[in-house]
Regions:
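Metallo-beta-lactamase
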Residues: 96-157, 292-314
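Hard-cation-handling environments
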Residues: 221-314
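Catalytic core of the metallo-beta-lactamase
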Residues: 3, 7, 22, 133-194
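Structured alpha-helical segments in the cores of large, soluble enzyme domains
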Residues: 185-196, 212-227
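Gly-rich Lys/Arg/Thr-decorated short loops/hinges at beta-loop-alpha junctions or inter-strand turns
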Residues: 162, 196-208
């Protein structure tokens, strides 16, 4: 028997957690936090609990490190999960950073406890390259291999191809994770899978038409110039991994294009100060230099990271 069960992101778009059942075994695709209205009254036990059987779960596959896809991993470990955490190589680097911040904000400030949890997570991480099959289990009556393909959503994001066999039944199941748009400034756009017998696909923005990235860039320029003309400051709530890097890149491209022009009175673009108040962001941004093979050429401009000043207050 090959089956799919959903333990999150069913009636909403957060808390992503899907189970692929292959005979008497299974894997999870993501294990994320419920957020916003879907979290009800917040981080309650009912929202964080792993309320499904995991005794047969052989591995967790992470599509990317946004908290609505990975935030319940500590609770999965506490529930007794002892299998590997399979993810892309960039995600393996970023996941402990992301979960450390999440643990400090929503779980505990106990440094020793946080380090124990992060140490356990690091010991379970199995980074795998894109475009290569990885065997999860291979038994007499059931087997499963997974392959990660670039999803273009954030650094390290992947969609997951699963090649499953159970009692002579074969099936290719694909889980999309979150997919990026075309013409992203930093990441190559995702390529479709070669085939799928079943496809589980996200639909967060399925009913929306977005403006072009070029229009968005010049609208950002107009906003900055309007605010700075009056001596103001622009505040942008862009906490999440991915959007912040995109925003820094877009601002850097404007600085490069309009360097000596004034963005405000006696303020040339090249002297524009950028302050990032988000502890996980700059370690991820500056760490991308070691992961340049996963980025679209030209690679991430390190200037966009070094120009930014971190206000790391937490």
């Amino acid at each position: 028997m090959i089956d799919i069960k959903h333990h999150g992101a069913v009636s909403g778009v957060t808390g992503s957690c899907h189970e692929l059942v292959v005979g008497r075994s299974g894997i999870l695709i993501d294990c994320g936090l419920f957020q916003g209205a879907e979290a009800g009254n917040g981080a309650s036990a009912s929202n964080l609990a792993i309320d499904f059987s995991i005794s047969h779960i052989r591995a967790l596959v992470v599509t990317h490190v946004h908290i609505d896809h990975v935030g319940r991993i500590p609770y999965l470990l506490a529930a007794g999960f002892d299998g590997p955490i399979i993810c892309s190589e960039p995600s393996a680097i970023m996941l402990p950073e992301i979960l450390e911040d999440a643990l400090k904000i929503g779980f505990t400030r106990d440094r020793a406890l946080i380090e124990r949890v992060l140490g356990l997570i690091r010991s379970r991480l199995v980074p795998v390259p894109y475009e290569q099959w990885h065997s999860v289990f291979d038994g007499k009556d059931e087997s499963l291999s997974v392959r990660l393909q670039r999803a273009g959503h954030i650094l390290g994001s992947a969609y997951v191809e699963c090649e499953a066999e159970s009692d002579g039944e074969f099936e290719r199941v694909v889980f999309s994770g979150d997919l990026g748009a075309s013409h992203a400034p930093l990441l190559p756009e995702p390529q479709p899978p070669e085939r799928a017998d079943r496809l589980v696909i996200e639909s967060t923005y399925g009913d929306k038409d977005h403006e072009s990235r070029e229009e968005r860039r010049y609208r950002l320029k107009a906003v900055l110039e309007h605010a700075l003309e009056d001596g103001g400051t622009v505040l942008v709530p862009a906490f999440s991994i991915g959007r912040t890097q995109d925003l820094l890149y877009e601002i850097e491209s404007l600085i490069h294009e309009f360097g000596s022009d004034e963005v405000g009175p006696d303020l040339p673009w090249r002297d524009l100060e950028i302050v990032v108040d988000s502890p996980p962001i700059l370690p991820v941004s500056t760490g991308t230099s070691s992961l340049s093979g996963t980025l679209k050429p030209p690679n991430w401009s390190v200037r966009a990271g070094t120009r930014s000043r971190s206000n790391n207050s937490r």
